[in-house]
Amino acid sequence: MSSIKGNKLEEQGPRPLQPTPGLMEGNKLEEQDSSPPQSTPGLMKGDKREEQGLGPEPAAPQQPTAEEEALIEFHRSYRELFEFFCNNTTIHGAIRLVCSQHNRMKTAFWAVLWLCTFGMMYWQFGLLFGEYFSYPVSLNINLNSDKLVFPAVTICTLNPYRYPEIKEELEELDRITEQTLFDLYKYSSFTTLVAGSRSRRDLRGTLPHPLQRLRVPPPPHGARRARSVASSVRDNNPQVDWKDWKIGFQLCNQNKSDCFYQTYSSGVDAVREWYRFHYINILSRLPETLPSLEKDTLGNFIFACRFNQVSCNQANYSHFHHPMYGNCYTFNDKNNSNLWMSSMPGINNGLSLMLRAEQNDFIPLLSTVTGARVMVHGQDEPAFMDDGGFNLRPGVETSISMRKETLDRLGGDYGDCTKNGSDVPVENLYPSKYTQQVCIHSCFQESMIKECGCAYIFYPRPQNVEYCDYRKHSSWGYCYYKLQVDFSSDHLGCFTKCRKPCSVTSYQLSAGYSRWPSVTSQEWVFQMLSRQNNYTVNNKRNGVAKVNIFFKELNYKTNSESPSVTMVTLLSNLGSQWSLWFGSSVLSVVEMAELIFDLLVITFLMLLRRFRSRYWSPGRGGRGAQEVASTLASSPPSHFCPHPTSLSLSQPGPAPSPALTAPPPAYATLGPRPSPGGSTGAGSSACPLGGP
């Protein structure tokens, strides 16, 4: 009892290094020393007064240990990071880098194999991404069948019109041309060349840019004959017998400082182009509205018109004049209130026309063909007779079968096309929708106005701009032919600026020809045409022609572009490659991303630590000392348990002298804390007795 009381008195006073009462008993001390994680038997079965005297001590606050996991935790080294990654990742082959670490040869083999596999996979990734960003397209072809809107049909007389308003100028041009042909080729027709008071030389001198013969040096043996660089018209009629001369006319700039000859090796081409050049100048003097054109009627050119076995009327066509092709008529254009529909294919369910092919007002020096010219196009597209038309022969029935096709292109990154031309840097001068031909002609007209100061008469012009005439623009011919060369070589950039439309409707045509009318039927056919139209056919077969235009079938083909590699396809291909080389899933990719992130963080922390150790050392100032102090304060408390070296646990003795003891430890560390086995011992926070 006295020992108990002594112990109680010692508990009331400060006892920094006194053991618990149960540890003072001999036999029980050995049991506790042999099994430290278990409870002391003396405390469990001892005096009740001892238990009451000690009482339950309040639980001390838990201090964080190295084994506890923080909210944000990073590995201490690269080695630890890679070992953790290889042990826990789902990527195949990574575990072999750790399992075979006792065999360096296997470790090296698997490391090289893993890196090569990784490189091969990302090489395939590069190919897949390269294919995706090249934006390839696939062409999808669909066949559809439905009622079809009949396209617009434009047909021209191939007979340049002799305007009454410029009759005198045209007759003067014909006389000068006849004189030129006589001087150059000794040709005289005696029909257009009339006698006058002026001589031939004086008559030719009244017209600028006369046609003349030019001597050129003979080409070397075996060399290819080429046209002048300034010429823009191809030699359609090659010369049979080579001579050391060419035919052309001279063109100069405004101040006559630069001149060139527009030459041709064929005299036919030279005369036609020279006559055409002067004919354009005469046409430019015509007023905007001509009464002679307004009086023109369809019956002067077309004898009969039927569509789906029903006769046409005046509301089904519109009329315009072309400088080279004469009077033109467009059937079923956008101005027609009720567009024609084709519900059946075949020659009897289309457009049938009987045409007059005679050329009473023919200008022989401007056009050398006879018949008619026809073109099939969309309702909202202009008729470019030079680009898409073809000629009809007199005395022949021409049957033209059509097949409709549509093409839908992809724009943006997949193709260079435009939806409506609003993003094209060329103003549309035509009253129609955007097409590539519309843009090209508008671009040339803009360049013509900018460089030459006047507009070309074959294309529409903006307001307040005059058509070219050498009476007002003396050097426009020089400018025009120079511009033609730049246009053909795309120095003007028109072919680059004018992109293709994203949606195009075209008609594939195929023609068949037959003699019409036949020998046995031509008498009554011509008699009926003469009685019906009050017109006498003089040359019979050469004065008429017939054309049939119809759908071959109502099936039409739709060609549409679609992306060959979409985002879904790309992800699928990437997943296939990842599974092929590593047999992993999307979560494995997340693991790789986590590994890269941890590598960056560890590298950053190591650099930061090195920076602090170099520039924030304690000897460099107060800031370094504060850093060290904060580092010590943030470190976990050490479990320091000093004890005298001469203390014997088997024999009790007096308390050690305060001079031999260490500074008092943190009392919170003397409280119970969980043991590795999960139980709480009274002496778990103290060092084992008997140690050095």
Curated annotation (Swiss-Prot):
Q: Where is this motif: PY motif?
A: 663-667
Coiled-coil region(s) at which residues?
none
Q: Molecular function (GO) terms listed?
A: ligand-gated sodium channel activity; WW domain binding
Q: What does this protein do?
A: This is one of the three pore-forming subunits of the heterotrimeric epithelial sodium channel (ENaC), a critical regulator of sodium balance and fluid homeostasis. ENaC operates in epithelial tissues, where it mediates the electrodiffusion of sodium ions from extracellular fluid through the apical membrane of cells, with water following osmotically. It plays a key role in maintaining sodium homeostasis through electrogenic sodium reabsorption in the kidneys. Additionally, ENaC is essential for airway surface liquid homeostasis, which is crucial for proper mucus clearance.
Protein name (database record):
Epithelial sodium channel subunit alpha
Instruction: Please report the organism this UniProt entry assigns to the protein.
Output: Pan troglodytes
Q: Which residues lie on this side of the membrane: Cytoplasmic?
A: 1-108, 607-692
**Comp. bias intervals (Low complexity):** 56-65, 682-692
Extracellular topological domain = 130-585
Instruction: Describe the subunit structure.
Output: Heterotrimer; containing an alpha/SCNN1A, a beta/SCNN1B and a gamma/SCNN1G subunit. Interacts with WWP1 (via WW domains). Interacts with WWP2 (via WW domains); inhibits the channel. Interacts with BPIFA1; the interaction is indirect via SCNN1B and inhibits the proteolytic processing of SCNN1A and SCNN1G and the activation of ENaC. Interacts with the full-length immature form of PCSK9 (pro-PCSK9).
Q: Does the keyword RNA-binding apply?
A: no
